[in-house]
A protein has these predicted regions:
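Extracellular, cysteine-rich, disulfide-stabilized repeat modules with beta-strand cores
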Residues: 126-129, 144-150
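Disulfide-braced loops of extracellular cysteine-rich modules
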Residues: 119-123, 139-144
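Detector for small/aliphatic-rich hydrophobic stretches
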Residues: 2-5, 13, 20-120, 157-196, ...
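C-terminal or internal capping secondary-structure element at the end of a domain, subdomain, or sheet
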Residues: 426-448
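Non-catalytic, conformational "gating/processing" segments within enzyme and secreted inhibitor domains
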Residues: 57, 95-123, 152-307, 317, ...
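Short linear proline/tyrosine/threonine-rich motifs used for host-factor recruitment
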Residues: 133-135, 143, 154-156
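Short loop/turn microsegments at loop-to-beta-strand junctions
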Residues: 58-60, 425-428
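Short loop/turn motifs at secondary-structure junctions and domain boundaries
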Residues: 419-424
Length: 448
């Protein structure tokens, strides 16, 4: 009797500031899309991963959403005890079909933020002419607000819709293996996955490079039979940009006894700030207001570890909720520019979390992926790779391209705005209020 050939499935995740790539799988069970239940599970899994990452040195950035989506695509191909074990390790309470439906809804929402293809609008009576709006004055010689007179014409700046380039892309790549037709169809339908039937290493890395706008050059060093990839790419202007002329070197305390000078941005405007046990948090919105970066700043210079342990899924959810409800107030914010790259092999991390069957071809059940009984098509995950890049500057957070309208800032500031000086190691979260997803998160211990 011929020996069944073992199939290897790698899971790939990459994030470029946000770009993230990860494999995903899911099956259909039915039920209403519950996006928030889905992202709660992703966020809970993300906090568990962050605790593991935090044992190492240096800055960190990763995408809980990307990793969660990748693992969901894998989960879609599992059955029986393998499915139950994966769902438990991933904090999932939804059934396979519910996970698939919720992912379809989340992807549609997140991919809908890019309005760069939507034409700008002009004030009434004016039309777009090149890079500005132009039209004739009224009979009385006036111009419609906010246009102004320029010679014989009225001119105004076009209004662009709030926009963020947030791309969620998935792929199923076959490099020597095969999958069931209904599994490939599921990924196409619910995850908008591209399917490549003859993939090479160049195909995989080239796809990742393209989907992350070159932020992630390479994700895999070796091929497996079946490759599942998720990529998340983000770039957006701040709702209120920082003035580059105000950026200057400021002290950043690496420890109580060591300080370094780092380029630090300054902004005086209104933000939501909350005080929590051991730390303060501030919400910095992007041009699309449902997207924001949240900074969690420990009260103590060396308090990052305690705050990170305290910020589990429940505390994170409560803190984000408190920020959304908090009225904005005048704030003098100092925030260092920073750029972080990070990569992680997640196989051992998930095994530590109790996920063992998906990595054991003798005992795993991937019959949903293969379309064959487990005994005739032994299959196992052999790679879970995640890479992420983030860059924060005066204009934007980097990892994608985006256009956004400027937001008018109130010029009159009280004499004593709240001081929020990010001059010590801190945590950050890039969140989407519409779905509840933590798209990226990390820590900065040294912004240089």
């Amino acid at each position: 009797m011929p020996v069944a050939q073992r199939r290897a499935v790698p899971i790939v995740a990459a994030a470029a500031l946000l770009a993230a790539i990860a494999p995903q799988a899911a099956a259909q069970v039915g039920g209403r899309p519950d996006v928030r239940a889905l992202t709660r599970a992703y966020n809970a899994s993300g906090q568990a991963l962050f605790r593991d990452f935090s044992g190492g040195p240096g800055n960190i950035v990763f995408s809980p959403y990307s990793i969660g989506t990748a693992m969901a695509m894998v989960l879609a191909g599992t059955r029986g005890e393998t499915e139950r074990e994966m769902a438990t390790a991933l904090h999932q309470s939804l059934g396979r079909a519910q996970i698939n439906d919720a992912n379809a809804s989340a992807i549609a929402t997140l991919n809908g933020y890019d309005k760069s293809a939507v034409p700008p609008t002009c004030p009434a009576g004016l039309k777009l002419a090149g890079e500005r709006c132009e039209g004739q004055p009224t009979a009385g010689g006036g111009c419609p607000f906010p246009a102004s007179r320029n010679g014989e014409s009225c001119v105004a700046t076009p209004r662009f819709p709030p926009s963020a380039k947030l791309l969620v892309a998935n792929a199923l790549m076959l490099a020597g293996g095969e999958v069931a037709k209904n599994y490939a169809a599921l990924l196409k339908d619910r995850y908008r996955a591209e399917v490549f039937e003859r993939a090479s290493l160049d195909t995989v890395n080239g796809w990742v490079r393209q989907r992350t706008e070159g932020k992630i050059e390479k994700i895999l060093e070796k091929l497996s039979d079946v490759i599942l990839i998720n990529a998340v790419y983000f770039k957006s202007r701040w709702a209120i940009v920082f003035d580059k002329k105000l950026t200057k070197p400021e002290f950043f305390s690496l420890t109580r006894s060591r300080q370094e000078m780092v380029p630090t941005m300054l902004q005086r405007t209104n933000h939501a700030v909350v005080s929590r046990d051991g730390y303060r948090a501030i919400r910095l919105p992007y041009a699309v207001r449902s997207l924001a970066m949240v900074i969690a700043l420990p009260n103590e210079v060396e308090g990052l570890g305690d705050v990170a342990r305290r910020l589990d899924q429940d505390e994170l959810a409560q803190m984000l909720s408190a920020l959304r409800k908090q009225p904005m107030r005048p704030v003098s914010l100092m925030l260092p520019r920073f750029k972080t790259e990070y990569s992680a092999d997640l196989k051992a991390v998930f095994q530590k979390a109790g996920m063992t069957l998906p990595f054991d071809a003798r005992r795993s059940d991937f019959s949903g992926l293969t379309g064959l009984p487990p005994q005739s098509a032994p299959t196992a995950i052999d790679q879970i790779v995640h890479r992420a890049v983030i860059e924060v500057s005066e204009e934007s957070t980097e990892a994608a391209a985006a256009t956004a309208i400027g937001i008018r800032v109130t010029s009159a500031m009280p004499a004593q705005p709240l001081q929020f000086r990010v001059d010590r190691p801190f945590l950050y979260y890039l969140v989407d209020d519409a779905t509840g997803a933590v798209l990226f998160q990390g820590r900065v211990v040294d912004p240089r």
